Amino acid sequence: MSPYAIGVGDFNEDNRLDIVITNNGIEDIGVLLGYGNGNFENPIMYRTGSHSSISVAIGDLNKDHRLDIVVVNNDTGSIDILLGQHDGFLSQTNYPTGSNPQSVAVGDFNNDTRLDIVVVNYYSDDVSVLLGYGNGSFAQQANYSVGSRPLSVAVGDFNNDTRLDIVVTNSGSNDVSVLLGYGNGSFAEQTRYSVGSYPHSVVVGAFNNDTRLDIVVANWGSDNVSVILGYGNGSFAKETRYSVGSLPKSVAVGDFNNDTRLDIVVANSRSNDVSVLLGYGNGSFAEETRYSVGSTSSSVVVGDFNNDSRLDIVVASWRSNYVSVLLGYGNGSFAEKTRYSVGSSSSSVVVGDFNNDTRLDIVATNSDSNDVSVLLGYGNGSFAQQANYSVGSYPQSVAVGDFNNDTRLDIVVANSDSNDVSVLLGYGNGSFAEQTRYLVGSVPWPVAVVNR
């Protein structure tokens, strides 16, 4: 058994967060209902008919104010829909997709106020669009060709006609496919735009302040990012590439010089640094400025750690035992890193206010020491010494949320070697109760918190 993804939501309408886990290796997913005190019931298993459920999305698909579940099955080339009831979920309804579906997004593609689904199919080089009837059921898929080996999908209105369009990264053909929506649930034939080598992830945003959506793509294989400016009519300019470090792994955006223009920060896993690219507000970016961080930079997050209204950066470094904090000067430059010790092999980092003092704190997962490190912020950009809390074996991902409705942030961690998740309840003073472990199968990896 190999659980792949974790989602969190209130599935039984008791105002208590529950957990859903997809499993790779058995034909079931597990739902763990929360008691509202940070504890959970034993999992209730729902059959999917797939041995490889690799992704999950949550939403109200039939407009009954109850959360439903969408599961991507990459071995059977299908998705499963499980409609939520007050006392659980109906048996899954299976909808065929293309071959080896990888990622899923939802949106209203035919302007009927009902959620629809788009799925990226890696081996069949297409996307499947399934229109929702508003009762939790979906029409048969309509497939649209894209490039080779598509991996990731995002949606947005690229031609300002109030109709959602689709953009897909194609890792095998080194381009992105843009499919314009007609507003009736169908899409025009793709238009392809070249990007760098092995494009993996895609984000949309307005980088030249013209209210027209643009595209930025992380090119894992060519050590750069591609920025593609939109004309607002559904077409895009030729890419402009900006060099970053070696093997960029994680990207975040924010306004680092307080000029109301979006900037980019990239964590480079091989060159052990971050690249900051300042935006000119016209869609172009200055040459990168590199800041040294730890070995094998694996995760980057931005936030204001010293309450000066200037964005700062925190980076987790997988082959080192610390996180690096770079304070922003508000002019686009950053102070030299300050390192804070954490456990062994920090793989993921998130921020939150764990002691309710309006100052951001840090939590990092430590894969080799089997714990998480919590560093409380002083509000001046510095942090207290780590407090470590044991979790399961080889923790890989972390998320935060209030699991017991006490207005205090709690922590959930996916442990890939012990096949479980750890929930640590927060006391609201920056400390946490001992973990409670919940068995989920084997090799849980990503974890996320989803609130309706």
Model-identified regions with their sequence ranges:
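Surface loop/turn motifs at the tips and blade-to-blade linkers of beta-strand repeat domains
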Residues: 1, 46-49, 94-99, 143-147, ...
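Beta-propeller blade termini
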Residues: 4-11, 33, 54-61, 102-109, ...
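Glycine-aliphatic tripeptides that mark coil-to-beta-strand junctions in extracellular
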Residues: 15-17, 65-67, 113-115, 162-164, ...
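Hydrophobic beta-strand segments that make up the repeating blades of beta-propeller
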Residues: 19-22, 69-72, 117-120, 144, ...
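Beta-propeller blade repeat segments, especially FG-GAP/WD-type strand-to-loop junctions
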Residues: 29-45, 79-93, 127-139, 176-188, ...
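Blade-level signature of beta-propeller repeat domains, shared across WD40, Kelch, NHL, RCC1
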Residues: 79, 83, 439, 443-452
